């Protein structure tokens, strides 16, 4: 007998189905067939280099297989375990995990960070590695508070093996007081973003030659945090910002606005309802602690939450709303 595997491809705005004839696997092969990689955040703080990180994650080389016999111009990508991952154009340049993150070791020496966490997302189609820098951002204290916020600085690199994400290196910060995590709200703070083209290696090398500019990125980020912490905010100004970020009158939107307003003066988590920095923290606290993330057929709640915190779209939206209302 011959089994048929249906592969759906989008080409010229039309979905086409192709049938691959293959010999059916044995019972043993079916039993031993591997499931997609599940989301997990691995502690890699004892890793000296990228090879150590990838060894801890048990990552090998990915491979490709031509599909010209059924669809000219496409190929199949398999992960390091031989499992089918996705179908891409035959011109897609597959970057091996060791290639995709090799630059991080040089960046580690330049910036002085230590590898911290790493893991797979999107069922093994994307991989990230994050490092923690020694330097921190301290927000100026206010009033009788002896100490301001402490923000840890992270350097995070992400790539995909199916073209769904360019290789991206960006600055992220973690608020120590309450574990609010957020991507940088200024997309100009990306260290590099390189698409999966045939010249991606040369482009990445050029981007890393400018790595000394990362310290300027951190300086600009620190200066913006200081500006936010020095600008006092009235309750009515906060309400305007809240309405810009969460537009509409639905029950879901009202719930989000109410939760964020409660976070604006949540002293337990270090927000005091006084400054533009408190405003910003109200939204990141909502995103970190209050926003409901749901499980889907392919992703867990934990992965969806992790992915939302790594997305710069929400903090960028908040920062733009603050600028619109407060002109800072």
Residue ranges and their predicted role:
Residues 2-59, 119, 134-328:
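Intrinsically disordered, low-complexity regions enriched in serine/threonine
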Residues 4, 74, 126-128:
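A generic structural signal for beta-strand entry/edge sites
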Residues 55-70:
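An N-terminal amphipathic alpha-helical segment
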Residues 66-91:
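A short, surface-exposed helix-loop junction/capping segment
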Residues 72, 110-116, 152-154:
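Short small/polar-residue motifs
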Residues 90-114:
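Amphipathic alpha-helical segments
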Residues 109-135:
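A short acidic/basic microdomain associated with nuclease active sites
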């Amino acid at each position: 007998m011959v089994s048929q595997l249906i592969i759906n491809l989008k080409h010229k705005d039309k979905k086409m189905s192709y049938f691959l004839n293959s010999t059916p696997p044995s019972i043993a092969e079916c039993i031993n067939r591997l499931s997609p990689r599940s989301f997990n955040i691995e502690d890699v703080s004892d890793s000296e280099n990228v090879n150590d990180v990838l060894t801890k994650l048990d990552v090998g080389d990915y491979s490709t297989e031509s599909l010209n016999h059924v669809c000219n111009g496409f190929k199949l990508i398999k992960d390091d375990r031989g499992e089918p991952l996705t179908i891409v154009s035959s011109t897609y340049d597959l970057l091996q995990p060791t290639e995709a993150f090799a630059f991080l070791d040089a960046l580690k020496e330049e910036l002085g960070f230590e590898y911290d966490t790493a893991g797979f997302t999107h069922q093994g189609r994307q991989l990230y590695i994050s490092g923690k820098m020694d330097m921190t951002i301290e927000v100026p204290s206010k009033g009788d508070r002896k100490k301001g916020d402490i923000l840890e600085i992270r350097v995070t690199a992400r790539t995909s093996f199916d073209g769904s994400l360019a290789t991206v290196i960006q600055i992220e910060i973690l608020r120590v007081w309450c574990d609010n995590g957020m991507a940088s709200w200024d997309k100009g703070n990306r260290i590099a973003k390189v698409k999966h083209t045939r010249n991606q290696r040369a482009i990445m090398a050029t981007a890393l030659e400018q790595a000394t500019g990362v310290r300027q990125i951190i300086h600009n980020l620190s200066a913006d945090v200081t500006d936010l912490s020095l600008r006092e905010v009235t309750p009515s100004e906060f309400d305007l910002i809240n309405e810009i970020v969460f537009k509409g009158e639905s029950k879901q939107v009202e719930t989000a606005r109410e939760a964020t307003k409660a976070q604006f003066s949540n002293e337990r988590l270090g927000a005091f309802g006084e400054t533009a920095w408190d405003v910003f923290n109200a939204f990141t606290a909502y995103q970190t602690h209050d926003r409901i993330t749901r499980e889907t057929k392919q992703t867990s709640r934990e992965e969806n939450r992790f992915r939302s915190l790594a997305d710069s779209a929400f903090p960028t939206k908040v920062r733009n709303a603050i600028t619109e209302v407060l002109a800072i």
